[in-house]
Amino acid sequence: MNRLILKYGYPITALILAVFAWVIYVRISRGSQLTTLAVAAVIVWVLATPAFIYFWPRITVTGFKRAIVNRGFGGGPIPINTLYAEPKVSSGSASNASLLGAGTDDVLYVAGWLELRNGPLVLHTPDMAGRYYGVQFTDPSSSANFAYVGKRTTGTEAGDYLLSGPGWKGTLPNGMKQISSPNNSVLVIGRVFVKSDSDQPTAFALAQQIQLAPLNQ
């Protein structure tokens, strides 16, 4: 939803404002008077809509940080720079599902909140043997996904990825691919496909192997 707001919010707002302007122009050209309420409505729309488009995605991403760091997803708070893998798929019922996967019953979720101010982190992904998985990285200042690791982009073989913050000038270790974050804070959401109920333990074992470690460790 956040991506849709960012992509279409401003064009739709511009279209509605153009309609408002045309209506006002027509009324003035016909000698009609504009009511105070109509003028106030236009002013509120002009000011509030861009503010909503700008702040709402950032508020929702920050909500993930509070949920991850302060509450967790059933196993207690999750430390910063740590990934947590849900052991079971979320219920198909939105009322019983976790924050990560309302209505999604065929993937296990992995989540964490990262802070890169003290240096880069290394993301390790195991050999998924062709299984679908994905790890997306989100910039909380814009709610935009800036990188993706997974079957669709990097394949399913085991890999190590250096996640660095803005301005990092270190040396990339051999065999690693670099992911440059535009922000020192990063929201990470991962998914591992579950084929069936009997496959869930295998999928969970793989999800647990999606791990983070400091570069110097």
Description of each model-found segment:
Residues 8-217:
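A compositional/structural signature for long, glycine/proline-rich flexible linkers
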